[in-house]
Amino acid sequence: MRCPFCGHDDTQVKDSRPTDDNASIRRRRACPACASRFTTSERVQIRDLVVIKKDGSRSTFDRDKVVKSLQIALRKRPVDEEQIERIVNGIHRRLESLGENEVPSKLIGELVMDVLIGMDQVAYLRYASVYRNFREAKDFGDFLGKMGRQGDD
């Protein structure tokens, strides 16, 4: 693998270990040219998923986009990065298990919301406010009312 610091073509793997959920391998690498060290992550990719957006356009599934949206929703909440990685790995596996090459963005949003509602209601509300495009305080109130009614069932 090419060194991200100096561009040298051949780096050495110093340490490899699976992540806690065994969904990927973390490798610690060293560059013999500049002596820099860096970490890489290796995952199995069954197929390239294409996301169909609301406007009909298509783009390659961007796992980091899901990670960032969860980090924003879970900011200052008692959830660490490893838990976020496990959530995203689970969502990605569910999408791949559908057997489809194309998935609607709405499905990804719903999967994220399904995880968040059982995990952290504040994060669920934060995510929903962006995902459902809340424009005013009334939208929050309406949504909280629906959450309360669902909890009563």
Swiss-Prot record:
Disordered as annotated region, ranges: 1-23
GO molecular function terms noted in the UniProt entry: ATP binding; DNA binding; zinc ion binding
Keywords annotated in UniProt: ATP-binding, DNA-binding, Metal-binding, Nucleotide-binding, Repressor, Transcription, Transcription regulation, Zinc, Zinc-finger
Record note on cofactor: Binds 1 zinc ion.
GO term, biological process aspect, one: negative regulation of DNA-templated transcription
Keyword Protein transport: no
Cofactor(s) essential for the protein: Zn(2+)
Pfam family for this entry, one: Zn_ribbon_NrdR
Start-end of Basic and acidic residues biased regions: 7-23
Family: Belongs to the NrdR family.
Entry-linked HAMAP family: NrdR
Listed PANTHER family: TRANSCRIPTIONAL REPRESSOR NRDR (PTHR30455:SF2)
Function: Negatively regulates transcription of bacterial ribonucleotide reductase nrd genes and operons by binding to NrdR-boxes.
Protein name: Transcriptional repressor NrdR 1
